Design a protein with these regions (language model features):
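Flexible, low-complexity linker and terminal segments
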Residues: 1-13, 17-19, 136-351, 356-357, ...
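Thiamine diphosphate
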Residues: 1-139, 167, 257, 292, 386-512, 520-528, ...
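Conserved beta-strand elements of the Class I
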Residues: 25, 76, 236-239, 284, ...
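A glycine-rich helix N-cap at a beta->alpha junction
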Residues: 46-55, 97-108, 187-194, 441-454, ...
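Short beta-strand segments
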Residues: 78-79, 104-108, 161-167, 239-240, ...
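Short helix/loop capping segments that flank catalytic or ligand/cofactor-binding pockets
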Residues: 87, 114-116, 170-173, 246-250, ...
């Protein structure tokens, strides 16, 4: 078939569609969002009734995908790296249950934290779950891995983890597609107890997983994504993982003088590793992320061979890998031709003009400064996190999805008053509801501001699970309806908003304020599409 110019994310999505996908499950998060959006917009999705709705969070996405696999269908789960923390309960246990229909989990990592709280490396999740992993070096490999990965998942009976990174997810390349496969029919496991993880059966299933490890290593040794290329200069051997191989080849367009082991599939291929180790004086590990392979090699080799990489300072311990850092690591002259002109100023993200979060912060901060000058506000993950910046300087925390409510409760437990949390509507239904339940169960003196812009705005305006139902959810959890207050955050309503904020902050119990106004960007898109 002819080539298409695709983002790395789009290559994954197209491969899944071509491989007979029956459902994609995801919660939006950069740099993974475009995978699901591409599937949602593809004509074949409607034609073949491929499930494609956003989930409340990554845990529900992982569980629903496992359910799709349970009935023999092929499923894709997509999330950013910190979403793996949310999905981990089901993800780790799915390695023990195994799968029926092919199941691929995409974890899009964000080295350098372009839009994330940390730069954790998802390969560690695959490693301690004992399942096979893919790590593509380019868009074509991303496509090929997913296309064949469903069949591989069904063959070995396990979910497959695929790790992407921001630069690969959000850059384009020509991708050659393969033939379209039909969706699987409904089938069930021959073992009726496969998915029942009672301790007695879980122990049996775990032994099955352990028995598959040699098969996984053999698959890695025979994989087209793990390739050993010899070189004349044996002073150095290079292990290049994922996009690190791409950066290495940018420095050696005519071929590398050193032996190179390209890694695209895990567990590590022992046969090729021995070949590299036995012929080279020292080893350099290139990986875009934490020293996952480097640590394994140090333990694998003992003290016999020197291993260089992030741990010894050859490469920086934080931030992205790039062609320049690879050039320095192999002792090549840095020939970068482009610098950043001094006239180009930093333009940090800011709340949009006309955004309802602005009006919420202005009124909330005015009230708190007047009544409680030493106040603290606990916030969360979303556009409103930008309230940390000038001119608002309105919040004191941003840790993880849903943490605003439970951190405010913990602070209230410790004697802080007022304890104020700010959270968005999508983040509230993702991970905030259980925190609110804790507050209700203990009648904590907490004021929770659910700033409702009726969408998941920061990642591009995806559907929010609680749209139009936030008040009902709060009441259902047990918040007194008299202390669930809805306001429209507009300048003309400032005095009304400030009065409501004063009343609810002074209330000794659980109170919820919902400033509701549609995201200004979503509204603009709707008007343009008319």
């Amino acid at each position: 078939m002819s080539k298409q110019l695709l983002l790395g994310d789009e290559a994954i999505a197209q491969a899944a569609l071509d491989a007979g996908l029956s459902g994609v499950y995801a919660y939006p998060g950069t740099p993974s969002t475009e995978i699901t959006e591409y599937i949602q917009m593809a004509p074949i999705t409607t034609e073949q009734n491929i499930h494609n709705r956003w989930c409340a969070n990554e845990k529900t996405a992982m569980e629903a995908a496992l359910g799709m696999s349970f009935v023999g269908k092929r499923a894709l789960v997509c999330m950013k790296h910190v979403g793996m923390n949310v999905a981990a309960d089901c993800f780790v246990n799915s390695a023990i249950t195994g799968v029926k229909g092919g199941l691929i989990v995409i974890a899009a990592d964000d080295p350098s934290m372009h839009s994330s709280q940390n730069e954790q490396d998802s390969r560690f999740y695959g490693d301690f779950s004992l399942i096979p992993m893919y790590e593509p070096s380019n868009q074509q490999e991303a496509y090929d891995m997913v296309y064949s990965g469903f069949e591989f998942s069904e063959k070995v009976g396990e979910p497959i983890l695929m790790r992407m990174v921001t630069r690969l997810a959000h850059s384009r390349s020509g991708v050659e597609r393969k033939e379209q496969k039909p969706q699987n029919s409904i089938t069930f496991s021959e073992d009726p107890r496969q998915f029942i993880l009672l301790p007695g059966n879980a122990r049996k299933r775990y032994k099955v997983l352990l028995a598959r490890q040699d098969e996984f290593i053999k698959a890695s040794e025979e994989s087209p994504y793990n390739k050993y290329t010899d070189g004349p200069n044996k002073k150095l051997g290079i292990v290049a993982c994922g996009i690190g191989y791409n950066y290495l080849m940018e420095n050696y367009p005519e071929g590398c003088e050193y032996p190179v082991l390209k890694i695209g599939q895990y567990p590590l291929p022992k046969k090729q590793l021995h070949q590299l180790i036995e012929s080279c004086d020292e080893i350099l590990v290139l990986e875009d992320g934490q020293p996952f392979v480097e640590k394994q090699l140090k333990g694998y080799l003992g003290i016999g061979v020197k291993v260089k990489g992030r741990l010894d300072g050859t490469l920086s311990q934080d931030g992205e890998l790039n062609p320049d850092s690879v050039a320095r690591a192999v002792g090549k002259e840095n020939k970068s031709e482009f610098g950043i002109p001094s006239v180009v100023e930093m333009r940090p993200p800011a709340l949009c003009e006309g955004c309802g979060h602005r009006d919420m912060y202005i009124t909330l901060t005015e009230v708190l400064k007047e009544e409680y000058p030493s106040h603290k506000v606990f916030s969360d993950i979303g556009c409103y996190t930008l309230g940390a910046n000038a001119p608002f300087n309105a919040i004191n925390s941003c840790v993880d999805m849903g943490a605003s409510i439970t951190m405010a409760k913990g602070a209230a437990d410790g004697g802080l008053f007022p304890a104020v949390a700010v959270i968005g509507d999508s983040t509230f239904t993702h991970s905030g509801m259980t925190g609110l339940l804790d507050c209700v169960n203990e009648n904590a003196s907490v004021t929770i501001v659910i700033s409702d812009n009726e969408t998941t705005a920061m990642t591009g305006g995806q559907d929010s699970a609680g749209t139009g139902r936030i008040e009902a959810i709060c009441a259902g959890i047990g918040v007194d309806p008299a202390h669930i207050r809805v306001v429209t955050p507009l300048k003309k309503n400032y005095e009304e908003m400030k009065q409501i904020i004063r009343e609810e902050i002074e209330y000794r119990g659980v109170s919820v304020i919902i400033p509701r106004r549609e995201c200004i960007q979503t509204l603009a898109r709707k008007k343009r599409s008319k």
